Amino acid sequence: MKQPVKQSTAADSSISGSRVLKYQEGYTWQERVRRAYKDESGNWTGVTRTSLVGGSDEIPVPFHLRYFEVEAGGFSSLEKHEHQHIVVIMRGRGRVTLGDHETVIAFGDVVYIAPWEVHQFGNPDGPEPLGFLCAVPAERDRPVPVERKSSDS
């Protein structure tokens, strides 16, 4: 005999340790706070980060899932690191730099970033923010900043 399916609400979104983070207006999620892209200043501007799963919350998983938004004219730091990550574009259009190549990205595109690949996300043209989900290992190294190559050389 089939058991009836219990409908979960925002107030009751935990099921045996599993849970649903309800999406809210404006690319936000219940019980999650949008923060600055990084705690320290650097060569980036107009980027925010929302930790969805893993990190400082109570969900113990071997990966972290975050949502980033890059406002018009904004960009992430140009960096590299040992860990790989996967990005899924959820909103807007922008550009990703992977090594020496720059590619236009838009809703639905998936970006894989290999270990030690120099990379950067940007939204040079706007008008809508570039929003993306990013999955990384919970245990990972710190990014290494990379100096932009001079176009004069």
What are the functions of these language-model segments?
Residues 48, 61-66, 85, 92, ...:
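A generic structural signal for short beta-strands and their flanking turns/coil linkers
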Residues 123-124:
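Asparagine-centered strand-capping/turn motif at beta-strand->loop junctions
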Residues 67-71, 80-96, 135-138:
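Short, conserved beta-strand element in jelly-roll/cupin
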Residues 100-116:
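Short acidic-glycine-tyrosine-enriched beta hairpin
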Residues 67, 86, 112, 127-144:
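A short hydrophobic beta-strand segment most commonly corresponding to one strand
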Residues 49-54, 66-81, 115:
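Conserved short histidine dyad/triad with adjacent acidic residue
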Residues 1-62, 146-153:
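A short, N-terminal "cap"/entry segment at the start of jelly-roll beta-barrel domains
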